[in-house]
Amino acid sequence: MGNRTIGRYIITDTKICHGQPVFRGTRILVADVLEQVASDMAWEAIIEEWRGAITKDAISEAVKLASKALVSHVPDLVVTG
């Protein structure tokens, strides 16, 4: 499979983080940043925590892609009590 461009800022590469989505030019997992966003962490604080290796535009792209993925998989979701 090699590498794949998912967006302007997000890629997958089997040689980086076992092929998990990361921000281009980093080893920062998109999932880690999305968890920070979900925990209501300010985007500026997220950027600072990652020492400026990601930008607001990169975080925005991750959120938009996650939203599209969720919407496209809604029929597959099972909500439990």
Name the predicted role of every residue range:
Residues 29-81:
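Long, charge-rich, low-complexity alpha-helical segments
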Residues 4-45:
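A short, structured beta-strand/loop element
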